[in-house]
Amino acid sequence: MKRTLVLLFTLIVCVSLIGAAEIKLDVQEHTLSNGLRILMIPKAGVPRVVCHIYYKVGSINERPGITGLAHLHEHMMFKGTEIMGVSDFEKHTAIDQKLDAVMNEIFREMFWTADGGDQDKIARLQKEYDELVKSEKQYIIKDALWTLYMKNGGTGLNASTGNESTGYYVTLPSNKVELQMLLESDRMAHAYFREFYSEKDVVMEERRLSENRPGFYFSEQVNAAFYSASPYHWGVIGWMDDLRKVTKSDLVEFNKSYYVPNNAVAIYVGDFDPENIVAMAEKYFGRIPKGPDVEPIRTYEPPQYSEKRMYGTGPAPTSIQMMFHAPYAGQDDSAALSVLASILGSGGGGGGRFRGGGGGGGTGRLYKSLVQEKQLAVSVSASSRAMWYVGAFQFRATPRQDKNVSPEDLEKALWEEIEKVKQDGVTSEEIQKVQNQVEARFIRSLSSTAGLARTLGRAALHRGWRTV
């Protein structure tokens, strides 16, 4: 069995930054009366348009008992609406309501009783459920959304859920953007969560596959220990027990609370006339009523006043992690720590110019010192991640077992490297080199229409697109 050591601390390091290059974006903005923001960047050339919609909702908007719901909801948004994905809405709805009633009974037996319920009753209800599922299938049109998009030249239909936001993406010919407006406004206003229980099984299988990866459980527990109170305490996939017990009514309430126009931003980048985009947005999205004001997260991460240590054993290489609480996105020192991580680790981050940085490249200070010179580690990395409400600075290293190097030996060596930075700082040449790399990488990300839309959308949800 391999042993892993994790240290959880608080870190304050200041690095002066050379002024970053200014990026100018030709963004046109329009806000509908219901609060939906439309951001447009016209780019003449290839007659295609990248269409993204971002909702300001992610795993941080969950609570204990419904963790993983934001990600599950993303899956369910591809199951159709009242008019899409079903051949006979009324007949299907009648069956679907019976399915919900049967599953509610099964849930009561399984989860609301101390002994796991009446097994004979559960078996009978399960048989009834299986028969209803067979009846339901005759009315379901599989992959209706994707099929319709593909028939009209659509590519790249996808979605993603993070801690703080959820995005839905498609690229279409310029003359088919109206189709995206029609379909996405329909999903926003009339999403229908058919096949909920089978899709929940799909998400639970995703989690099982993650659990089979070496080190998954330990990393999950490290994260839970590091973020003790805030909703960053759990991962986007959620806890398995919550996934088992989450109900369709939980999902419906989640949808009503967060999938509203005043909690979203639509991004269009490509060959189009902005006036036409605004007119179509008013026509389709403008008819959706404004939703309730979205409540911000309540629980912020409290200060950590003492060191935490975790030891674990399992089928994974021996390693050490050291994590430090750090400034969150937008705070002055978050950019400095991103640069420091790249100097130490010499790798690439993401999520904006200075939202994340670091890596484990062969040109970083840590690699030169701990791998090449002292030969204490097989690999070593440093990373900085600044999120909306929390930040983390992290070291990871794998000791040289052939030289009997222990995690404690590596811990001591890492502290020595930290002290060097605190005592001697970093050179202007190191800062300039990293800044050049970060700027080049950031500009490359903006050179693609999809990368530009993604950067713009996520920034718009947080501190505004002008902070890009």
Give the ranges of each region predicted by the language model:
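Positively charged n-region of N-terminal signal peptides that target proteins for export
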Residues: M1-T4
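His/Glu-based metal-binding/catalytic segments typifying zinc-dependent metallopeptidases
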Residues: R208, A224, D293-R365
